[in-house]
């Protein structure tokens, strides 16, 4: 089954073709992503109306490009998957409208995919994928969650952020230190030049039971340290390193607790912050110490992309789960309400 996947929940336009007749990483026939970073940079953040309009301009050309790279014609598609939520309602509607129109014209089934389920399942596209049960750390600009995965489609929320998501904390911290948008990746690169231990910040909520997160206080600590410093380039790098170390250690501590609570030693990490090198290394070390595995998607599939939507959609289409023939999106959507596959 060849499934066309469309992602348009925020500021990336993603399209991919996933072929269930192939195995491992080869099943991803082609994928392409267009990022709107340059469009939103002058505003310091995503402008929803501009995001929607840019999806309108870029989506169909990206579909044509992806099909060409896969060596397929539009008539070779057996199903269409699209992000139905959560996300920006206007941006979601662009992708849903194109997906439903293609499915209707081709007379093939279509299914709306939960954006975060797409992230969660992305590591399963790699060679030697993990098998449930496992714990997933979903860590991005909009979400920081620990989820127990009993089976595909059977999810239990173990913990989540009570305020800022980890990726959001990276971006906001970078902005208050004067780094350009998008700040998170810039801060991570700067942290590589920082001196370990020069600044040590709190590891929020690790001194108490539970699996929830809070990063707003950490952001305030960084702000105070930056204001009281000489604000030199080396100090900027040292503070960035201290902040990154605090976030990475906090996530690692909570992940280990979540594995113990869920009774497994396999951790799956997905979402934009999952591309962070220091986080990957720390969780890999933790999993090996526990005799388990830490599984990640390739860095290109950590950020929003059509590949994860095509894959998640293919699993549901193969299970006979189709969406009603209408353009419908769910900007706020609890992943625990999804049906099992």
Curated annotation (Swiss-Prot):
UniProt entry tagged with the keyword Metal-binding: yes
SUPFAM superfamilies given in the database record: Actin-like ATPase domain
UniProt keyword list: Acyltransferase, Cytoplasm, Iron, Metal-binding, Transferase, tRNA processing
Residues binding Fe cation, per UniProt: 115, 119, 304
Molecular function in Gene Ontology: iron ion binding; N(6)-L-threonylcarbamoyladenine synthase activity
Main localization (coarse): cytoplasm
Catalytic activity: L-threonylcarbamoyladenylate + adenosine(37) in tRNA = N(6)-L-threonylcarbamoyladenosine(37) in tRNA + AMP + H(+)
Binding site for substrate: 138-142, 171, 184, 276
Domain of life per record: Bacteria
Disulphide-bridged cysteine pairs: none
Protein location: Cytoplasm
Cofactor note text: Binds 1 Fe(2+) ion per subunit.
GO terms, biological process: tRNA threonylcarbamoyladenosine modification
A GO-annotated cellular component: cytoplasm
Enzyme Commission designation: 2.3.1.234
Function: Required for the formation of a threonylcarbamoyl group on adenosine at position 37 (t(6)A37) in tRNAs that read codons beginning with adenine. Is involved in the transfer of the threonylcarbamoyl moiety of threonylcarbamoyl-AMP (TC-AMP) to the N6 group of A37, together with TsaE and TsaB. TsaD likely plays a direct catalytic role in this reaction.
Protein's UniProt name: tRNA N6-adenosine threonylcarbamoyltransferase
